Every structure is written in structure tokens, then in C-alpha cells.
């Protein structure tokens, strides 16, 4: 038949039914949304396939059996093949006996997956069930020679040897443990602390491990699985399951595991339930029974089943009871098991619609509520009609059924239209809820046409697209980045939210009343009852009937009212429906299409064009959508900015050496650091020096230049004044004496003519001929003054730059203490000098530093939902409010609301018609997915992930920075901490929302205010201790229709989401990175970490075994200061022998990149270093020898870099020698002028005084 042999044997053809099934009706498809429908269908099918395994397909014809097996299958001996097959078919389809029926209820075992097979094989002799009353209540497993069993699991281990062991209790970990006998230790599990992120195996398949949490798909694992092990691919136990909690589409597991030190740790998510198989009991007529096994079910006794559900509505096992009541025992499960079918307990209803085609009306498709809180553009509606059920209450997809004056009718869902400003696309419906995707609009309208009548209902609601992320886009992009968001689930999974139901009240149905002759006849529907009230003349009739009855006293239909009564169906507890008389039986059903965590594609704005300047960055922005730009400084004061950019713009920012960060839209953060660079040349001419230091230190440079200018000005002015004063004092006596002869020296000093010498040359000639000593003194005085001033200035003004020593360079024999900066990625190198031993190098690099605060959850807040009871209406009588016990519940009695025979109640009285209105507050249906958590933060613990190298031994370890907890590796004992700075970015009160942390001073529990954060508060998402304060006020209803009007403050949670500032992720100081699960800050560049080493002797090397240098010379080949290892030093040496030597700089002038170098007997070694000094001069230690390295460094060329500098940033660049030379020269010239003036003044004064005494 085939030209080749198939690789695998062909499967038998499936069984074909000879009777063709009726063809399904064809419905036209909606072309514009075809791609969307295919995508949603694929997603739904994937969910169903992943979360449950479908039933096996119908069996095909039996495969061809070997001849030796044929006699065993033939019971009649001489029957042929056809007869044999007919016998099989008959045996399969015939009426089974009770034993066979009980056996058929059991599904055939499905073939487990690869992971399950592996775990089952390993569990067979290492895991033992714990039995309680004949049922498996949990499991115990043997790991590492010890028996572990959960402490909350009661019962006896199904092994005589293990059951006889005496166990010890560890209540902190919810475990009991004991040592197993020696003969059983060979067949035990091995455990491991290695847990890389990925998938692991347990009894039910795959377990995902991510961010320190184990999760499984929802529905996988349940009560009775406590104690089961989770294994890796090598069959080692990584955790033991204790319980779980549903979180949307996933279930988080509570587990016990081991850390790197082999210490047991326990992780328990919030609201976790223990998975011991404890039977939940329910109540019926004062008789208890297991909730999963009710004595009645809905298909057999509907009214009694609803009453049973109402009694147990607050029972923890209500979901089990509801599921069992809907699926009667003995019924075969179908592939739609995951889709709850509980809405067959309800029926549609007619309610008042505020806006129909013309005014208000009593509509079969009244819209009760509209929600659009997701980020995917979908809308969830709650209506009075129902979806997924036909008129008989059976499951039927893509169908809507509605109530038309007591008659339930159905219509295909594609004939129902929904639109806002434009038509919507209806995705699916379930129960009272409809999921659709709608364009933006201020109202939403639903309508359908039946025959020639069009039914419609509109409600005001602003439908808009809610973008996620930091760009305000209006339509999902085709390409972009994936970001966590909240989307409406497209399935009817049980996610823990409920909608309240109750038995419907009496509803007027005029179609039940007819006129037969001159009498009124009331005919109730088959199987239902009707309440008849008539007022005929002076006769009042009030009677309940279940079959047609004629009332001869009444001759007009208007004299009677017929109310339909139904106690076998629930309806939604709507304020548009009247409440049933007496005690109303309430229930609750699950809400489909809830918000769930998902991934959304968000747009990426065009990358900004970045221009770097001197300590500045310029961003040229071109957003396509309004985009947020957030910046912060990575210093102690973040000085953050947060701006929404809608148009092309240019923004300029200052960048410092401590760093600067900006976040543009949905792009990841980018960080920049400034380098110590500037124009000019610190080793050049004066104007180049001034330009360089003006850009680096503008204020200091201006101040220094101002001081120098003032000194020069004062010097010139003082010298001039002194010279003039001396000249006047010297010449005045001679000017007052007639014919006085002025001495030659005085004439020269005072620039005055003598009687004998007319010119300067004549004066010098006179001194040369008459007094040569004075001649040489006159010439040497200025030169001597210049020499003296120059020497004085050299001693006074030559300032040595101040450098701070970073830390100790050596240590004692066994112990070494040092301090390293608390900054991730920056290496710290040092050596340990010990007498008689070679220096031991130590290198430490922190890869990550975590700061984890101790937090206490105060409460959870979210959107609130206003619950309204159907109003209790009493005609011809009064009512009172019953005591209130629900959150923010309001109750009020209104009298005279409904007039005689008109309005919603159709009362027969004109007065004393009362209505009791009740409203209260509850958590929204989507509170589980969309909520904020208010925490109080306390003392924080610090963890440092260090890469440590001691000598030639390296290790990556985690250290608790508390000064107490040591870490041991290769015999080295390391103790870190405590931090030099007790600092945390978290305030005392913090709020966690959508994976981000906010410092927010929230109100205390029980002190919330309307319209503000905390207006509703609950201790946990699932707890029932709800506090609410929403300013709920009931208003008087109008007579036209039954309703409960009210006013209420807007949601404080929603207002807080609109007004909240940027989270700590964008505003934390010191460049902290903020994360959740657990709440923590990482890589905060603040403070320093003290380290204490205790090093064993084995790691030291004798000095005789290491080389020694006989000659060494260091030259700086290249040096760029304030740059990442921008210096290169070459050391030429002669060594005693080849070997490896530690290198170190004892001072803090330079930071070396290398911790050790390889030496030969003669050669050179190249060493890279970083320095912040313009003229570095440091001693370099190589083994036990020292060599001095010095030279000049130039500023870096790049103004801005994308990584922090790996040198000690506490050192600032010193003033260059060239600058000191120019400054000394400037100040020296000014001082010479002053000293010359002082010398002249002194000589003149001495001469004048001597001359006066002589005279």
C-alpha cells in the first residue's frame, strides 16, 4: 500500500458510529475578529490541555490478536469473529449490575508522564502513606537516614517498623522526625540544597521553582498530598510539600527545604492551607455528612438542594458541597469538568433598565454591572440574561437565554450585539457574565432582535483602554517588551470570587390571568405555584395555587394580580428585584472571567539621543505616546524628577561622580557616572591651568584667583605708599635748608638730584670714586631682598597635598581585620604580612548585597463593591430594620413609596406601603489579583554575596553582615559586619502594589477614611474580617420601579493609584534596586563592611620558598587619573628565583588590579592601577621588597562613563606642581615688591634718625 515501511506501527482506525450525528447548525463568522477568535480559542484549549487530561477517545476495533490468545477470548467455542465482536458489544452496552456499575464509575488509569513515572518509581520504597480511618491522610518519606512526616498529618504510617519509631517534633518547621533503622538507610532519598530555577518533579508531574517559590498549575495537588517529596532530575529531594494556596492560575506550595549550610528552612505563602486529608463536614436537618458526599443533589431534589446549600453557605466546604450537588453521584464526568456548571441552579430574570430604545423599560437584558479594570481592553458585564445555557438549563456554548415575561427563551450569541462608540467583539459568556472587547466610549449598549422586536439596554460607563507600564498608549502594539499585567481570564475557572444568589421574590405576571366568560381565571405554569391576590368589591383574596383556578367573585382582570412563585431556582441578589417574603434562602456562585496575572506587550519609545558634556547629559526625546521620564542621583539625596513627555523635547541633567540614572518609558534604567575630567592642562601655562581648575572646582578657583589678585594689589599699593612716604621724609629736611647739599646715596635712593651730581651716572661715578662700599651695597640690596623672599616663600607656600589613608596594609599572624566599601562590583585587595612568611594576598568582590527588612502585614486594601439586598417590600404594613453585621452596612425604612396599584410593587393599599433598603460593602471580585498590601517595616538584615580569594583558594559564599555569623571555607573563618551605617531605604510604613514598593504613611487598621487609601481594610485577601468606611448613604427610591438608590464616596484605592508618586524603584537613594518576594533592597552603595579573617597556618608560605628581589625599578608608562585602572606601571627587576608574588600598595594612593604576579629570574612585570592623584607617588610591595613608583597623570578624555570608578573615591586630585610653581612665582613677585619698600623705608628712617642725632 505504501512504497516504504513506516517508522512506527500504524494505530488501529477509531470506531465509527454507523448512525450519523445530526449536523450542527452553521453560524456566520465575524470576519474582523477572526484572528482574535483563533488566538483566544488556542489559549483556552491550551489551558484545558495543561490543567487536566481529557478522557480517552472511543475505543476502535480490537487489534489483531495472536492466535494463541484467541481461545481465551472466545466463550462460545464455535462462534465466529463477527459473533464474538457482537458479544463484546452487547456486553459493553447491556444494563450493568450494581457491581459492574460501581466498577464502571472508576476511570481507567491514564498513562502518567515521564516525570510522574520517575517519581512513582523512586517513591515506591521511600515514601509511605499515613492512614487515618482507612484513608490516606498524608505521606511520610525517608531522607538522608531520617524519617520525616508533617506534624499536622494525623494517623499511623503504613509500615510497622516506621510506625514504631519515636519521633521528635519541630513545630517551627511543622515536621516530626526520627532516625530510621540501620538496615533501611541504604534505601533512602538523598537531599540537596542546589535549586537552580526551573522545573522539578513530584507525584503529580512538574513543579516550577522561580524566585524562591515552588508553584504548580491550579488543580494539581490537593489535600492528602502533604509530605510528598519534590525531586530533581537526579532523584534527590529538594523540598517536602506541606500545603498550598491558589494564586490565580497557579498554586503556590508550602515546603520545607534546605539551604547551603544544610539547615532546614520553611517557606509558607500567605493564606496557605495544610494539605492533610481532613474531611469537611456539612449540615442538613441537624445531621452532619461529608461535604463531598451530600445525600441529595440538584437534579433529583432541586428545592431541597438549594435549601441545603443555603444552610452551609458559610461552611469552609461549601465549594465541595456545591460541586457534589451539581454533579449527582453516578453521573459520568465529561471533558468540561473544569468549567463549573453551577449556573444551572439559576434562571434569568427581567429587571429595570435605565435607558432602553425609548426611555426606561423592563428589559430581559438589563445590565447590572460593568467592569474594565484589566490592561487588555476587555470588558466584563453582568446582565439579567444568562450565557452558556439553553432554555432547559443544559450546557450549550455560544448561547444566550433570557426571561420574557416568565418564559425562558434562547438565542444564539452571535445574534446579540454589544457596542460603545463602535461595535464590540463578544468573546464568551458564562452564567450572568459576558466578556467582550470594546472600543472606547462613554456608554455601553446591549441589544438583540427577536422577530420584529428589538430589545436593548444602555448604561453610562466610561470604557477606555488601561495601559500598563510607563507609556500611555491607546492600542496594544504589535512588537515591544513583555511586562507583567492583569488581564481578564478567558475561562470559567474557580478563582475564589463569588456572586450572591437568593430565591426570587414574588413577581407579577399578568400573562397568568385570563378572563373566562365573566370570571377571572389564573393558570400557573406547569410545575410551579402562583400567589393570587384579588380585591373584588368588598372581598379580598390571597391564595397560593399550583393549578388553574377560576375566581367567580372577580369580573375584571384588573381586579387581580398573579405572582409567580419558584423555589427551585436562584436569581442574582439584585436591587431591581423584590425580596421574597420570610427568611430568604441565600447562596453564592463563582464569578467567571476574573482578573489574573499575565504578560502584556508594551511599546518601546524611540531611544533618546544622548549627548555627553562636562558633568552633564543632554537627552533629545521623541515620544510616540505620552511617556514618563524619571531620573535620580545615585547619592544620599536622590533629587528625583518625574515628568510626562508628550512632545519632542530636550532635557539637560547634571551628572556627578556618584552616578545618575534615568528611565525612559518602558526601557530598562540606564546609569552614568562623571569622571574627573576638564578642559585645559594642569601641567601647562597659567591660562591652561586656570581653565582646567575652573571647570573642576569653579568656586575654589575663583576664590584663589581673587585672593591672589588682592595680594598683588595690596602689595603694589603698600610698596608705592611706603616709597612715597620714605622719599618725602628723607627730602623734607634738605628742602627746608637753604643751599643744603644732599648726600649721594640719599639722592640715589630718593631719585633726587644732588648739588654736585646732576645725573644718575654722575651720582654713581661719585660713589665709585669716593665710597665704593656704598656703591656695592646699593646694587646688592634688591638682589638680597629677592633671594630672601624667594627662600621664605619656598618654605611657606610649597604645600604637600593631603591624602587620606584607606586602611591598614598588614595584619598579625592569624587574624586580619579590614574594611571594604559596601558597593557591589568593586574589588578590595589587601595582603597579610606575617613574620617569616611570604605576604598572603586577599581579594574580595561583593557581587550582590541584600538588605531585607522585617515586615509585618497590617492589612490589604483594594476596590470595594457595593452589595445590595433585594428590597423588602410590604404592602399595607410596616417594617423595621434588622441588626446590621456586615461591613459599612446601611439600612433604612421608607414609607409611602409605592402608590395604589401602580409602580413596581402593585400594592392594593394607598398608604403604609413600606420598603426596607439595605446596602453594604464587600471586596471586589478582582481583589485577589488587584490589591495593595500595607506593611510596617522594622530592623533589616543584610546579606552579602562575596567572591573571596585567599592566596590561591577561591569561593563564592553568602555572608550575613551582622558581626556574629561566621563563614568557614578552606579553614578560613570570616566574620562580616555589622555595617558602618544603620541605614535602610524603607520607611516605617510601606505599601506593596503591582510588584513595587512605596513609602506611604497609610492609616492604621480600623482608622480608614472615605475616599482615601485604606477605606476598606482586610487582614488578608481571603479573610472575612473586613473593615469599611465609604460614606454609604441610602436615598429614597422612586415609585416607578423597584430599586435601592444610594450615594457613596469614590474608591480610595483607585484614587491612590492615580495620585501615587513614583515607587522606590525609581526614587531610592544610593542607587538601591528594590525587589519584592521578599521585600528587599539590593546593591545600595552606602557605608562599609568590616571584615575579620582567621587564617590557618597551612595557607601561608615560608619566605624561603618565595623569590626575593635584588634590584627593582618602577616606571609609569601611562597614567590617567580618576579612571578605571587607567595607570600602567612597569617594574624591571632581578629575582632570586622564579615564582609567584603578591603585590600591594600599603597606602591608599593607588588601587591595584592584580593581586599577584608571576616572576622570572630577570624581567619586567606590568601592573595596572587606579588613582585619583595628579602626581601619584606610592610604594609598591612585591613579595617582601618595596619599590617606589611616581610620575604625572593626565585627566581622562571621556566626560561620562557607564560604570562606576574602581578606585577609592575618597581621594581628590591634588593641585599640580606646575600650578604650585606659577602660584609661588606670583606670590613671590608680590612679596619682593613689599620687602623692597620695607627695606627702603627702614634705611631712610635709620638715616634720618642718625642725621638728626648728629646735628
Curated annotation (Swiss-Prot):
Segments forming domain Peptidase S3: 126-275
GO biological process: clathrin-dependent endocytosis of virus by host cell; fusion of virus membrane with host endosome membrane; proteolysis; symbiont-mediated suppression of host gene expression; symbiont-mediated suppression of host toll-like receptor signaling pathway; virion attachment to host cell
Region (Necessary for nucleocapsid assembly and virus assembly): 1-33
GO CC, alphabetical: host cell cytoplasm; host cell nucleus; host cell plasma membrane; membrane; T=4 icosahedral viral capsid; viral envelope; virion membrane
UniProt entry tagged with the keyword Lipoprotein: yes
Entry comment on modification after translation: Structural polyprotein: Specific enzymatic cleavages in vivo yield mature proteins. Capsid protein is auto-cleaved during polyprotein translation, unmasking a signal peptide at the N-terminus of the precursor of E3/E2. The remaining polyprotein is then targeted to the host endoplasmic reticulum, where host signal peptidase cleaves it into pE2, 6K and E1 proteins. pE2 is further processed to mature E3 and E2 by host furin in trans-Golgi vesicle.
Record-annotated site: Cleavage: 275-276, 334-335, 757-758, 813-814
Pfam families given in the database record: Alpha_E1_glycop, Alpha_E2_glycop, Alpha_E3_glycop, Peptidase_S3
Active site: 152, 174, 226
Cystine connections: 282-291, 353-457, 356-361, 424-438, 485-600, 534-560, 536-554, 730-751, 862-927, 875-907, 876-909, 881-891, 1072-1084, 1114-1189, 1119-1193, 1141-1183
Region (Host transcription inhibition): 33-68
Membrane topology (Cytoplasmic): 723-757, 791, 1247-1255
Region (Interaction with spike glycoprotein E2): 168-173, 260-264
Location of region: Disordered: 44-119
InterPro entries: Alpha_E1_glycop, Alpha_E2_glycop, Alpha_E3_glycop, Alphavir_E2_A, Alphavir_E2_B, Alphavir_E2_C, Flavivir/Alphavir_Ig-like_sf, Glycoprot_cen/dimer_sf
Transient transmembrane before p62-6K protein processing as annotated region, ranges: 730-750
Catalytically driven reaction(s): Autocatalytic release of the core protein from the N-terminus of the togavirus structural polyprotein by hydrolysis of a -Trp-|-Ser- bond
Motif Supraphysiological nuclear export signal: positions: 41-48
UniProt keyword list: Capsid protein, Clathrin-mediated endocytosis of virus by host, Cleavage on pair of basic residues, Disulfide bond, Eukaryotic host gene expression shutoff by virus, Eukaryotic host transcription shutoff by virus, Fusion of virus membrane with host endosomal membrane, Fusion of virus membrane with host membrane, Glycoprotein, Host cell membrane, Host cytoplasm, Host endoplasmic reticulum, Host gene expression shutoff by virus, Host Golgi apparatus, Host membrane, Host nucleus, Host-virus interaction, Hydrolase, Ion channel, Ion transport, Lipoprotein, Membrane, Palmitate, Phosphoprotein, Protease, RNA-binding, Serine protease, T=4 icosahedral capsid protein, Transmembrane, Transmembrane helix, Transport, Viral attachment to host cell, Viral attachment to host entry receptor, Viral envelope protein, Viral ion channel, Viral penetration into host cytoplasm, Virion, Virus endocytosis by host, Virus entry into host cell
Enzyme superclass (EC): hydrolase
Marked site (Involved in dimerization of the capsid protein) residue numbers: 200, 233
Residues carrying covalently attached carbohydrate according to the record: 286, 652, 947, 1083
Residue ranges, annotated region (E1 fusion peptide loop): 897-914
Record topology, Extracellular segments: 276-701, 758-769, 813-1225
A molecular function GO annotation: structural molecule activity
Protein name: Structural polyprotein
Amino acid at each position: 500500500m505504501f512504497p516504504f515501511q513506516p517508522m512506527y506501527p500504524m494505530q488501529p482506525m477509531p470506531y465509527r458510529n454507523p448512525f450519523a450525528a445530526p449536523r450542527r447548525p452553521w453560524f456566520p463568522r465575524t470576519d474582523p475578529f477572526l484572528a482574535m477568535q483563533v488566538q483566544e480559542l488556542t489559549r483556552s484549549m491550551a489551558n484545558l490541555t495543561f490543567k487536566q487530561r481529557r478522557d480517552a477517545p472511543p475505543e476502535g476495533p480490537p487489534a489483531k490478536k495472536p492466535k494463541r490468545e484467541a481461545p481465551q477470548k472466545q466463550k462460545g467455542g464455535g462462534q465466529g469473529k463477527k459473533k464474538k465482536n457482537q458479544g463484546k458489544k452487547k456486553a459493553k452496552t447491556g444494563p450493568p449490575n450494581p457491581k459492574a456499575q460501581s466498577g464502571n464509575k472508576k476511570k481507567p488509569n491514564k498513562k502518567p508522564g515521564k516525570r510522574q513515572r520517575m517519581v512513582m518509581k523512586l517513591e515506591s520504597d521511600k515514601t509511605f502513606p499515613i492512614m487515618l480511618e482507612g484513608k490516606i491522610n498524608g505521606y511520610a518519606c525517608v531522607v538522608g537516614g531520617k524519617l520525616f512526616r508533617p506534624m499536622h498529618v494525623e494517623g499511623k504510617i503504613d509500615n510497622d517498623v516506621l510506625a514504631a519509631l519515636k519521633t521528635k517534633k519541630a513545630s517551627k518547621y511543622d515536621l516530626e522526625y526520627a532516625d530510621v533503622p540501620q538496615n533501611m538507610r541504604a534505601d533512602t532519598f538523598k537531599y540537596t540544597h542546589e535549586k537552580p530555577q526551573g522545573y522539578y518533579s513530584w507525584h503529580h508531574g512538574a513543579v516550577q521553582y522561580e524566585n524562591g517559590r515552588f508553584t504548580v498549575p491550579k488543580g494539581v495537588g490537593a489535600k492528602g498530598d502533604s509530605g510528598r517529596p519534590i525531586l530533581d532530575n537526579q532523584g534527590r529531594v529538594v523540598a517536602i510539600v506541606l500545603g498550598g494556596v491558589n494564586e490565580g492560575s497557579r498554586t503556590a506550595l508550602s515546603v520545607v527545604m534546605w539551604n547551603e549550610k544544610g539547615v532546614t528552612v520553611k517557606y509558607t505563602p500567605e493564606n496557605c492551607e495544610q494539605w492533610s486529608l481532613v474531611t469537611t463536614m456539612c449540615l442538613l436537618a441537624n445531621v452532619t455528612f461529608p461535604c463531598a458526599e451530600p445525600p441529595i443533589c440538584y437534579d433529583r431534589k432541586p428545592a431541597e438542594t438549594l435549601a441545603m446549600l443555603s444552610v452551609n453557605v458559610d461552611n469552609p466546604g461549601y465549594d465541595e458541597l456545591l460541586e457534589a450537588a451539581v454533579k449527582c453521584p453516578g453521573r459520568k464526568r465529561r471533558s468540561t469538568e473544569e468549567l463549573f456548571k453551577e449556573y444551572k441552579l439559576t434562571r434569568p430574570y427581567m429587571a429595570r433598565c435605565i435607558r432602553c430604545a425609548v426611555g426606561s423599560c423592563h428589559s430581559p437584558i438589563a445590565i447590572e454591572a460593568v467592569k474594565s479594570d484589566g490592561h487588555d481592553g476587555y470588558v466584563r458585564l453582568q446582565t439579567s440574561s444568562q450565557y452558556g445555557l439553553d432554555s432547559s438549563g443544559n450546557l450549550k456554548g455560544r448561547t444566550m437565554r433570557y426571561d420574557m415575561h416568565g418564559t425562558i427563551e434562547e438565542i444564539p450569541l452571535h445574534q446579540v450585539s454589544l457596542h460603545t462608540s463602535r461595535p464590540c467583539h463578544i468573546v464568551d459568556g458564562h452564567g450572568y457574565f459576558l466578556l467582550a472587547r470594546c472600543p472606547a466610549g462613554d456608554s455601553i449598549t446591549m441589544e438583540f432582535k427577536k422577530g420584529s422586536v428589538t430589545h436593548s439596554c444602555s448604561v453610562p460607563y466610561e470604557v477606555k483602554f488601561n495601559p500598563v507600564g510607563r507609556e500611555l498608549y491607546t492600542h496594544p502594539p504589535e512588537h515591544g517588551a513583555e511586562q507583567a499585567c492583569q488581564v481578564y481570564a478567558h475561562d470559567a475557572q474557580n478563582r475564589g470570587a463569588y456572586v450572591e444568589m437568593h430565591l426570587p421574590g414574588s413577581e407579577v405576571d399578568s400573562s397568568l390571568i385570563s378572563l373566562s366568560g365573566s370570571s377571572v381565571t389564573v393558570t400557573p405554569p406547569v410545575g410551579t405555584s402562583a400567589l393570587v391576590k384579588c380585591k373584588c368589591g368588598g372581598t379580598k383574596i390571597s391564595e397560593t395555587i399550583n393549578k388553574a383556578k377560576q375566581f367567580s367573585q372577580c369580573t375584571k382582570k384588573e381586579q387581580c394580580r398573579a405572582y409567580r412563585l419558584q423555589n427551585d431556582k436562584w436569581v442574582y441578589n439584585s436591587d431591581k428585584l423584590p425580596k421574597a417574603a420570610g427568611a430568604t434562602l441565600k447562596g453564592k456562585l463563582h464569578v467567571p472571567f476574573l482578573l489574573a496575572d499575565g504578560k502584556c506587550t508594551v511599546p518601546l519609545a524611540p531611544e533618546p539621543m544622548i549627548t555627553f558634556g562636562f558633568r552633564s547629559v543632554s537627552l533629545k526625546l521623541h515620544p510616540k505616546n505620552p511617556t514618563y521620564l524619571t531620573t535620580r542621583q545615585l547619592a544620599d539625596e536622590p533629587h528625583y524628577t518625574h515628568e510626562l513627555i508628550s512632545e519632542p523635547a530636550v532635557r539637560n541633567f547634571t551628572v556627578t561622580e556618584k552616578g545618575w540614572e534615568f528611565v525612559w518609558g518602558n526601557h530598562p534604567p540606564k546609569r552614568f557616572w562623571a569622571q574627573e575630567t576638564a578642559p585645559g592642562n594642569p601641567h601647562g601655562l597659567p591660562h591652561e591651568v586656570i581653565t582646567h581648575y575652573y571647570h573642576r572646582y569653579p568656586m575654589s578657583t575663583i576664590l584663589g584667583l581673587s585672593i591672589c589678585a588682592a595680594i598683588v594689589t595690596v602689595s603694589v599699593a603698600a610698596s608705592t605708599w611706603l616709597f612715597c612716604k620714605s622719599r618725602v621724609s628723607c627730602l623734607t629736611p634738605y628742602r627746608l635748608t637753604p643751599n643744603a647739599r644732599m648726600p649721594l646715596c640719599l639722592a640715589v635712593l630718593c631719585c633726587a638730584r644732588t648739588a654736585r651730581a646732576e645725573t644718575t651716572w654722575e651720582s654713581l661715578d661719585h660713589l665709585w670714586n669716593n665710597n665704593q662700599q656704598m656703591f656695592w651695597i646699593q646694587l646688592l640690596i634688591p638682589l638680597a631682598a629677592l633671594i630672601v623672599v624667594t627662600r621664605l616663600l619656598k618654605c611657606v607656600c610649597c604645600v604637600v597635598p593631603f591624602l587620606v589613608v584607606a586602611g591598614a596594609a598588614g595584619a598579625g599572624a592569624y587574624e586580619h581585620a579590614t574594611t571594604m566599601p559596601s558597593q557591589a562590583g568593586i574589588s578590595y585587595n589587601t595582603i597579610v604580612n606575617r613574620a617569616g612568611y611570604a605576604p598572603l594576598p586577599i581579594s574580595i568582590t561583593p557581587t550582590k548585597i541584600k538588605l531585607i527588612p522585617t515586615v509585618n502585614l497590617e492589612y490589604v486594601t483594594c476596590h470595594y463593591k457595593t452589595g445590595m439586598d433585594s428590597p423588602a417590600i410590604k404592602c399595607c404594613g410596616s417594617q423595621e430594620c434588622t441588626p446590621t453585621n456586615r461591613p459599612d452596612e446601611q439600612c433604612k425604612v421608607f414609607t409611602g413609596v409605592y402608590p395604589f396599584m401602580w409602580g413596581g410593587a402593585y400594592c392594593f393599599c394607598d398608604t403604609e406601603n413600606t420598603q426596607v433598603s439595605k446596602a453594604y460593602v464587600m471586596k471586589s471580585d478582582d481583589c485577589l489579583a488587584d490589591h495593595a498590601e500595607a506593611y510596617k517595616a522594622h530592623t533589616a538584615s543584610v546579606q552579602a554575596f562575596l567572591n573571596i580569594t585567599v592566596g590561591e583558594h577561591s569561593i563564592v559564599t553568602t555572608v550575613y553582615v551582622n558581626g556574629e555569623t561566621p563563614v568557614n571555607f578552606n579553614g578560613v573563618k570570616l566574620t562580616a559586619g555589622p555595617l558602618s551605617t544603620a541605614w535602610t531605604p524603607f520607611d516605617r510604613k510601606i505599601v506593596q502594589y503591582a510588584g513595587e514598593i512605596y513609602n506611604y504613611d497609610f492609616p492604621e487598621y480600623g482608622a480608614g477614611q472615605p475616599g482615601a487609601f485604606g477605606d476598606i481594610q482586610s487582614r488578608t485577601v481571603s479573610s472575612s474580617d473586613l473593615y469599611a468606611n465609604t460614606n454609604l448613604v441610602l436615598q429614597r427610591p422612586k415609585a416607578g420601579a423597584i430599586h435601592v438608590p444610594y450615594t457613596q464616596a469614590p474608591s480610595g484605592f483607585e484614587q491612590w493609584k492615580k495620585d501615587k508618586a513614583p515607587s522606590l524603584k525609581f526614587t531610592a537613594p544610593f542607587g538601591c534596586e528594590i525587589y519584592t518576594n521578599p521585600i528587599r533592597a539590593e546593591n545600595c552603595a552606602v557605608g562599609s563592611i568590616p571584615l575579620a579573617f582567621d587564617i590557618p597556618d597551612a595557607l601561608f608560605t615560608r619566605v624561603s620558598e618565595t623569590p626575593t628581589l635584588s634590584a627593582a625599578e618602577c616606571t609609569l608608562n601611562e597614567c590617567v587619573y580618576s579612571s578605571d585602572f587607567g595607570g600602567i606601571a612597569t617594574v624591571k627587576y632581578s629575582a632570586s628565583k622564579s615564582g609567584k608574588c603578591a603585590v600591594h600598595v600599603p597606602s591608599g594612593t593607588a588601587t591595584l588590579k592584580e593581586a599577584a604576579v608571576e616572576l622570572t629570574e630577570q624581567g619586567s612585570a606590568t601592573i595596572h592601577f587606579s588613582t585619583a592623584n595628579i602626581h601619584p607617588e606610592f610604594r609598591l610591595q612585591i613579595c617582601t621588597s618595596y619599590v617606589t613608583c611616581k610620575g604625572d597623570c593626565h585627566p581622562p578624555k571621556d566626560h561620562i562613563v557607564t560604570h562606576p570608578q574602581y578606585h577609592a573615591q575618597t581621594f581628590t586630585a591634588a593641585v599640580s606642581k606646575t600650578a604650585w610653581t606659577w602660584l609661588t612665582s606670583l606670590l613671590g613677585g608680590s612679596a619682593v615688591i613689599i620687602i623692597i619698600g620695607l627695606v627702603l623705608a627702614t634705611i631712610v628712617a635709620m638715616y634720618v634718625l642718625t642725621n638728626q642725632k648728629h646735628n
